[in-house]
Amino acid sequence: MRKVAKRIKDIRKDIDFNELYALKDAVSMVKERAVAKFDETIEISMNLGVDPRHADQMVRGVAHLPNGTGRNVRVAVFARGEKAEEAKASGADIVGAEDLFESINSGTIDFDRCIATPDMMLLVGRLGKILGPRNLMPNPKVGTVTLDVANAVKASKGGAVEFRVEKAGIVHAGIGKASFGVEKIVENIKAFASAVIKARPQGAKGEYIKRVAVSSTMGIGIKVDPATVCSE
């Protein structure tokens, strides 16, 4: 317990929790404090000025991170015939139709992203109660219901990150690893923020991005000046 207490004290040292730090400074501070024995994920959390209980204030989309996430993303694809072969050739980890349906329906979910061709959605739709809560349900709005399965698989493995606002008006995502350089993390965060801004719903009034924080898996959140996140 003493070691844990000391670690927490060290992490909190020299941080002003009332300060809004410039993005680059915040990322540097988070990286310096990511001292776990594994490569911690760097995460961003954004509080938005929306109430997702209203349909016209839902925020959902996909961000394409220029430097990837640092994760080995496992991709499952629902497809048949030629499209199934395209998915396999593009690096999909799991490809199937009824067999994949049965596997998921029995509780086997060993993938991070799910893609489907449009003709498969009648089958995939029956898995809504399983895939929906896990944010794995294919959706044309984020490019996971498509005939272009090859590019969808490549995008998923190359840094595509889905986001969806939660009840409290928060969107969050892992946008890299502590082993990434500061500039790469900053570039990824700006790409994520840009996608969130583009996804601003018509029903959103007033200030859209209210608060931003950056953290690592085992670290604490550091407040970021939203203006430095949204600037070019």
Curated annotation (Swiss-Prot):
- List, in alphabetical order, the Gene Ontology terms for molecular function in this entry: rRNA binding; structural constituent of ribosome; tRNA binding
HAMAP family per UniProt: Ribosomal_uL1_B
Which organism encodes this protein?
Bartonella quintana (strain Toulouse) (Rochalimaea quintana)
What is the documented function of this protein?
A: Binds directly to 23S rRNA. The L1 stalk is quite mobile in the ribosome, and is involved in E site tRNA release.
Q: Which InterPro entries match?
A: Ribosom_uL1_bac-type, Ribosomal_uL1, Ribosomal_uL1-like, Ribosomal_uL1/biogenesis, Ribosomal_uL1_3-a/b-sand, Ribosomal_uL1_CS
Q: Which family does it belong to?
A: Belongs to the universal ribosomal protein uL1 family.
The answer, when asked if Cell cycle is one of the entry's keywords, is no
Q: What keywords sit in the KW lines?
A: Repressor, Ribonucleoprotein, Ribosomal protein, RNA-binding, rRNA-binding, Translation regulation, tRNA-binding
Please name the GO terms of the biological process aspect recorded for this protein, alphabetically. regulation of translation; translation
Please provide one cellular component term from the Gene Ontology annotations of this protein. Answer: cytosolic large ribosomal subunit
Descriptive protein name:
Large ribosomal subunit protein uL1
Its assembly, as annotated, is: Part of the 50S ribosomal subunit.
Q: Which NCBIfam families match?
A: rplA_bact
